[in-house]
């Protein structure tokens, strides 16, 4: 099993898909990495040589911000928005959708489960 930037890549998946298991790498970025390193995107992870793994590791560590570094940067950006008190920061602080989605209905993922209000009756 190939290990890149602290993530074990699945053995039986194609490289194009396996690289997406790393936080910060999607399909497009995965294809860019494979093209830059000269590795076939249809090759399986288990078929990689040690040299190819080394080339991939060096490319990713040298050119991209992934995994822990990227997570820390995103958290720092959110913290900064909360501290300066901008609209997005207020939405983060209140646990509401940040990017303008409706909240009268839906938004349950961000708001959490419904809380029933005592004494509220349905009007007929």
UniProtKB/Swiss-Prot annotation:
GO terms for molecular function: rRNA binding; structural constituent of ribosome; tRNA binding. Coiled coil: none annotated. Residues 95-124 are annotated as: Disordered. It comes from the Bacteria. The keyword Transport does not apply. GO terms for biological process: translation. One of its GO terms (cellular component) is small ribosomal subunit. Keywords: Ribonucleoprotein, Ribosomal protein, RNA-binding, rRNA-binding, tRNA-binding. Belongs to the universal ribosomal protein uS13 family. Located at the top of the head of the 30S subunit, it contacts several helices of the 16S rRNA. In the 70S ribosome it contacts the 23S rRNA (bridge B1a) and protein L5 of the 50S subunit (bridge B1b), connecting the 2 subunits; these bridges are implicated in subunit movement. Contacts the tRNAs in the A and P-sites. NCBIfam families: uS13_bact. Part of the 30S ribosomal subunit. Forms a loose heterodimer with protein S19. Forms two bridges to the 50S subunit in the 70S ribosome. HAMAP family: Ribosomal_uS13 (MF_01315). This is Small ribosomal subunit protein uS13. It comes from Mycolicibacterium smegmatis (strain ATCC 700084 / mc(2)155) (Mycobacterium smegmatis).
């Amino acid at each position: 099993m190939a290990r890149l930037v602290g993530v074990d890549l699945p053995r039986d998946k194609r490289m194009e898909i396996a690289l997406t298991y790393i936080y910060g790498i999607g399909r497009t970025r995965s294809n860019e990495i494979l093209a830059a390193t000269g590795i076939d995107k249809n090759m399986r992870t288990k078929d990689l040589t040690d040299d190819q793994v080394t080339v991939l590791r060096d490319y990713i560590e040298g050119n991209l911000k992934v995994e822990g570094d990227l997570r820390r940067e995103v958290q720092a950006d959110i913290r900064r928005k909360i501290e300066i008190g901008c609209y997005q920061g207020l939405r983060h602080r209140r646990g509401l959708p940040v990017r303008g989605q409706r909240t009268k209905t839906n938004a349950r993922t961000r708001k959490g489960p419904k809380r029933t209000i005592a004494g509220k009756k349905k009007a007929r």
